[in-house]
């Protein structure tokens, strides 16, 4: 399949952790971050260091919101995707595989973002 987004990241977001899988032409790397602000800033720094251009995450409850709010200040295309649009693959049962699957779908341009209002509307 054709690569659409060569430098991308899939995030599997949970209450206490975020698993991030970065895919670049050089390869793939997965890291785990906690959800405290300090840790999310480390995630943002890592994405910048890897020169990521696109980031996708599932719209899991409210846990995606602090990550989205922090990353929207960077020069990234952010996608928050309905979990129903990320079809389950048999045997895909771990958080690491979830992050890799999201990154792979994003890499090939197979994800569509949900509508997220801009910051001023979200703060109303």
Regions found by a protein language model. Give the residues of each.
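Phosphate- and other anionic-substrate recognition elements at nucleic-acid/protein interfaces
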Residues: 1-124
């Amino acid at each position: 399949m054709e690569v659409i987004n060569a430098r991308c990241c899939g995030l599997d977001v949970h209450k206490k952790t975020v698993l991030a899988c970065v895919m670049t032409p050089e390869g793939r790397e997965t890291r785990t971050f906690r959800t405290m602000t300090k840790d999310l800033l480390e995630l943002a720094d890592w994405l910048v260091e890897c020169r990521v251009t696109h980031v996708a995450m599932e719209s899991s409850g409210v846990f995606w919101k602090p990550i989205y709010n922090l990353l929207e200040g960077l020069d990234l295309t952010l996608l928050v995707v309905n979990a129903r649009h990320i079809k389950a693959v048999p045997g895909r049962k771990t958080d690491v595989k979830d992050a890799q699957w999201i990154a792979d779908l994003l890499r090939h341009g197979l994800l569509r973002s949900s509508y997220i209002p801009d910051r001023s509307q979200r703060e109303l």
